[in-house]
Structures are given as C-alpha cells and as structure tokens.
C-alpha cells in the first residue's frame, strides 16, 4: 500500500484506538502528540504511537502493521481497570472477553471476566447501515463522529511531522 493511496497503521488500526478513547472520555481530546515510523518502501506509517490529552485524563496507544499481532484495550482508573481482549476485529471462532478488576490487587485476584458472544461485527455494521438507508432511519454512528475521528487522526499526523503537541 502506497502512502498516496492511504492505509498504514494509524488509518487502518489507530482509528479504532482513537474512537475507543473518544467514546470512553465522551469528548474530543484537547491536544495530541504523535510519533510515527514510516515504511521505507511504501511510505505509510508502520508504527504509530500517540498521547491524546482529554479534559478528564489521557489516552495512550500504539498501533502497527508490522509488529506481532496483539490487540487489547486497557482502561486504567483510580478505582480499578478494564481490559478488553481483541476488541476491534473480534474473532469469529471464540468470544471476546472483558476483564474487570475493581480490587486494585496487582496480582489480579478478584478479576471478573465477561465473555461476549461471537459475531461478525463488520457484517453487523453493514446490516445496520443498510437498514438505516433502506428504511429511512438514522445510522448507528452519525457522520459527525467520523469527521471528529478524522480530525484527531490528522492532528496525530501533524504532530508527528512537526514534532510537537497539536491542539484540536
């Protein structure tokens, strides 16, 4: 994939990290800082890390197209933590799991595990969009959400290029 055609870690994977962070905080970040390593052959970002500074805290993520596959979301708070296993492209052959730890025990005793039924989430998204179009209803996620996510993505690219925080 050539950079002139799009693609790369941030567009293809990091978009989900940004969306999950925006959803968790219920807001756009105030500012972002990013660091990008580009593939010398294709020019796309193959490794991207960013800090998103929200009014209520920070989100940090790393995404890559060329590292060993690993996918988790961790929410860390003052009273506990949540970990979601393979949240963005859930496997079809086993459930995605969420781990809730409200004990604060560093060894993880008392973690509650919840398994979600297997599903083809991309088909479900397409079906929901089709129903909204065919039946004249609202789409599950409005266009404004995609525009907001893209603003954050572009800010991460700008930050990496300039080597400084970018305010949204």
Regions found by a protein language model. Give the residues of each.
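Conserved loop-to-helix N-cap of the C-terminal "lid" that shapes the substrate pocket in Rossmann-like
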Residues: 10-14, 119, 140-146
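A broad structural signal for alpha-helix termini and local helix breaks/kinks
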Residues: 24-25, 54, 133
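Anionic-ligand binding region
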Residues: 34, 45-50
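Residue-level detector of beta-strand structural context in well-folded domains
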Residues: 9, 48-50, 71-73, 157, ...
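NAD(P)-dinucleotide binding in Rossmann-like oxidoreductases
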Residues: 38-45, 54-124, 142
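C-terminal helix-rich "cap/oligomerization" subdomain common to oxidoreductases
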Residues: 128-168
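Predominantly a Rossmann-like dinucleotide-binding segment in NAD(P)-dependent oxidoreductases
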Residues: 1-41, 163
């Amino acid at each position: 994939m050539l950079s002139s055609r799009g693609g790369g870690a941030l567009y293809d994977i990091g978009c989900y990290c940004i969306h999950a962070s925006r959803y968790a905080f219920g807001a756009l970040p105030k500012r972002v800082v990013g660091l990008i390593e580009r593939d010398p052959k294709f020019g796309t970002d193959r490794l991207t890390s960013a800090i998103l500074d929200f009014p209520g805290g920070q989100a940090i993520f790393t995404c890559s197209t060329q590292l060993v596959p690993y996918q988790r979301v961790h929410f860390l708070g003052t009273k506990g933590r949540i970990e979601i296993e393979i949240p963005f492209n859930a496997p079809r052959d086993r459930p995605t799991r969420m781990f809730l730890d409200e004990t604060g025990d560093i060894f993880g005793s008392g973690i509650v595990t919840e398994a979600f039924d297997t599903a083809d989430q991309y088909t479900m998204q397409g079906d929901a969009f089709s129903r909204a179009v065919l039946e004249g209803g609202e789409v599950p996620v409005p266009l404004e959400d995609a525009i907001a996510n893209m603003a954050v993505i572009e800010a991460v690219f700008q930050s990496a290029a300039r080597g400084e925080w970018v305010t949204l």
